[in-house]
Amino acid sequence: LSDHALPEETGPYILVSSTTEAMKKIAAFYRTQLSCKVVGITGSVGKTSTKEMIASVLEQRYKVLKTEGNFNNEIGLPLTIFKIRAKHEVAVLEMGISDFGEMHRLAAMARPDIGVITNIGLCHLENLGTRDGILQAKTEMFDHLQVDGTVILNGDDDKLSTKKEVNGKPVIFYGVGADSAFDIKKDIYATDIENHGLEGMCAKIHTPPVSYTHLRAHETGAYLV
């Protein structure tokens, strides 16, 4: 791709008015040709850690492609999508934004089957104004969720807990502890968190009706649960 004419010795190329826009359109088309499931992850903080943990769990059973580093913007996301091959069963894609409309453009490429939002914090207030503005911008992801898609939200976040339904389907909420300060029921929650410093942490992960599963993670900081 090039937005200007190149010398003949350069070889074949496609002349476009904007290489960035062309790349996004090609990525969106390529996504329609893929059969793998896509997990889209966003949030004010914790995107990359959450992406790494989700990919690590899924890799125990599936062929997974994940966003490398934080290639999560309008250039990094299409480059990641182009790496998906027929062998991949799941793609875990991180999406980062700083203004309105960006998530709309990212999600139009990713078309996630599962959408995960970690939290609504105070990042990029210079463009988004308030936490309600951040909520609005992040949840643009839902406009491009697959028809049978699933939304997973942090039930301990006061803003995200207001989103009880998306496209007429109930949201899956997760959090720490069974009780909620908001009017929701947590579907997945952690209890008995033990922080062992550099040796990692332990917790019980409850997924009713199953009682719980023991979790041991080699991560420092109980907040990562």
How would you name each of these model-derived features?
Residues 14, 65, 172:
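General small-molecule cofactor/ligand-binding pocket signal
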